[in-house]
Amino acid sequence: MNYNHNQIEKKWQDYWDENKTFKTNDNLGQKKFYALDMFPYPSGAGLHVGHPEGYTATDIISRYKRMQGYNVLHPMGWDAFGLPAEQYALDTGNDPREFTKKNIQTFKRQIKELGFSYDWDREVNTTDPEYYKWTQWIFIQLYNKGLAYVDEVAVNWCPALGTVLSNEEVIDGVSERGGHPVYRKPMKQWVLKITEYADQLLADLDDLDWPESLKDMQRNWIGRSEGAKVSFDVDNTEAEGKVEVFTTRPDTIYGASFLVLSPEHALVNSITTDEYKEKVKAYQTEASKKSDLERTDLAKDKSGVFTGAYAINPLSGEKVQIWIADYVLSTYGTGAIMAVPAHDDRDYEFAKKFDLPIIEVIEGGNVEEAAYTGEGKHINSGELDGLENEAAITKAIQLLEQKGAGEKKVNYKLRDWLFSRQRYWGEPIPVIHWEDGTMTTVPEEELPLLLPETDEIKPSGTGESPLANIDSFVNVVDEKTGMKGRRETNTMPQWAGSCWYYLRYIDPKNENMLADPEKLKHWLPVDLYIGGVEHAVLHLLYARFWHKVLYDLGIVPTKEPFQKLFNQGMILGEGNEKMSKSKGNVINPDDIVQSHGADTLRLYEMFMGPLDAAIAWSEKGLDGSRRFLDRVWRLMVNEDGTLSSKIVTTNNKSLDKVYNQTVKKVTEDFETLGFNTAISQLMVFINECYKVDEVYKPYIEGFVKMLAPIAPHIGEELWSKLGHEESITYQPWPTYDEALLVDDEVEIVVQVNGKLRAKIKIAKDTSKEEMQEIALSNDNVKASIEGKDIMKVIAVPQKLVNIVAK
């Protein structure tokens, strides 16, 4: 008889709910384990089969750690602000709150039906005012620390939609919705000074148990480089000014034959000569239609225009042309570069296209053919001639410093974090702009600053957020002075709520502080964080930044939030393609839970292959996982639902070795998240159980304990069939006996005149004499030596007996 998954799974989910089986108590003295999932955005589509892969992995570890006596924190919540809900509201006229609430209910039902052991009393929702009160509070701390400031930043402005779009909503210079033209337009924006923490964010990666590939992604994103800042005087009687550039190769300055500024550079308009004004203006307009990604595409043809202006090379004294080109971004470095075409591929391409001088300053290449980017001695470089790269860099910086034209500098690719969004569905930024030009943050005791309800969620038309349309929200008067003010109408990005949610789980109902310091001390850092690699840079970098600020403020006790991080792989469609609605190959977990059961889905997703691999979904594999659970059930349970008589309380030793091997292997594999090989070993054990007449009850109990973290519903049901009234959740994890990992018996071969005549199992410690006796009394051997004289018997302990007979 196969087990009825619908009945059993519902029964145990109700039991866990009613008994609050997974409620976490803050036993501050107990050893702890904090297992965290990247909380989902509750979309209208609900859960897909990719979600449970990571969730099952953390759930197995959480259940395993509880059985090992740990105080486990395993929570779940909702990253519920964001664009899709706002888009839905714009399209339907419905409130995004309703949409979000409905989606959360669906997600929660689906997650509960998969049997995850979350403590639902700790659920958080980033759109709950009691939650975003503390998101706003953190913003105020950032502001007070000088880490939040207002700046003019170029944004994607779409006049037809009357709104600012994120980079993801712009495709080839037009809006994703409606295909309207999009322009880059400077607007006042809130920016967070993440660059202040660049060195710490870089250095502390070394202490984290994260995949090296992921650490490298963060290192590259931060992009620390050492070099020099160099000033070129503009050679123009009317326009005073200096062009500042950052270069990692100040030693090549004698080869700098032109400068390139970004089209948005502050100097462009003042230095451009009348003759070139029209061309420059037209080029700036074209550049404003392109995203940064398009502008820096290495494959695209280089474009640019001459400004008519010149600068003076501070070391050679030569005049060099000043150009503008869209491949130089105003947001990177100083927004200007010194071009050394002889030794840089991009500059070489540009110089060739516009017939600009190419001056060789490092020997070893042929600059007629291509840029030379290798090592070599300096030439045509004044005092640097004859020096190799490193020595020349040091000398060049020295010369620049003497002339007051440069200095040694560290640069970062990392930009400050653009923090405001021109959206309605986000956390209001708690700032008031007063009519006298000052601004203040909302007093902390007045938090949360509530997001006003409105049925008019439409773009403001000015580029401000829809909040700008709500006068009752925007306009304020200072009670003490009578001064009028306007509230900030930008809202925070979706990243804000996810920067610190792992802290709120620790103390989710605290009304007086972000979280109790004693509880933070107990639970931090997160011991295991599992999620998709798509969050490798932004979410993880932003969360680390906020955590470091909170550490400096004395609020959190650790420098880093997440000690161990693991990225699960992607589950692909049956044809190895990414699952997507358009391809029609998305698999809904609800259907699988109905047809095969949640335990089967969990087991299958862990058995597909290594947790970090991308693997194609297979219906056959799913069926195979179900068959294994049916085999386990049939081994233990009779047709009438009673426990099989095959399970006995005496040990005939037949399963000693395989049981102890299984406990050892599963324990070791769980520690390394090697769930696929742990499951293989559980299958080996069940196969051995089918080969014997009796199964020792403590061994099958140990097996059920090892199966339960993976397949918890059938685990609980079998545990109760074994005569236990309490849940399996807090039962002690099985242990193994080293001595029983090896056999007490060995198989020996018996040869007569060099020919194999028998294989016999004997005790390991059998003496040579006993081996000879056993061999000679074997029926096959007797038949082979009948009528012959035994000349010699050689016994090799634990191996063989060789009989020579004539």
From Swiss-Prot:
It is an enzyme of class 6 (ligase). This is Leucine--tRNA ligase. Its EC number is 6.1.1.4. ATP binds at residue 581. InterPro entries: aa-tRNA-synth_I_CS (IPR001412), aa-tRNA-synth_Ia (IPR002300), Leu-tRNA-ligase (IPR002302), Leu_tRNA-synth_edit (IPR025709), M/V/L/I-tRNA-synth_anticd-bd (IPR013155), Methionyl/Leucyl_tRNA_Synth (IPR015413), Rossmann-like_a/b/a_fold (IPR014729), tRNAsynth_Ia_anticodon-bd (IPR009080). The lineage of its organism: Bacteria, Bacillati, Bacillota, Bacilli, Bacillales. It is found in: Cytoplasm. The keyword Cytoplasm applies. A motif ('KMSKS' region) lies at residues 578-582. Keywords: Aminoacyl-tRNA synthetase, ATP-binding, Cytoplasm, Ligase, Nucleotide-binding, Protein biosynthesis. Its main location: cytoplasm. It catalyses: tRNA(Leu) + L-leucine + ATP = L-leucyl-tRNA(Leu) + AMP + diphosphate. Pfam families: Anticodon_1 (PF08264), tRNA-synt_1 (PF00133), tRNA-synt_1_2 (PF13603), tRNA-synt_1g (PF09334). GO terms for molecular function: aminoacyl-tRNA deacylase activity; ATP binding; leucine-tRNA ligase activity. Belongs to the class-I aminoacyl-tRNA synthetase family. Coiled coil: none annotated. It comes from Staphylococcus aureus (strain MSSA476). One of its GO terms (cellular component) is cytosol. GO terms for biological process: leucyl-tRNA aminoacylation. A motif ('HIGH' region) lies at residues 40-51.
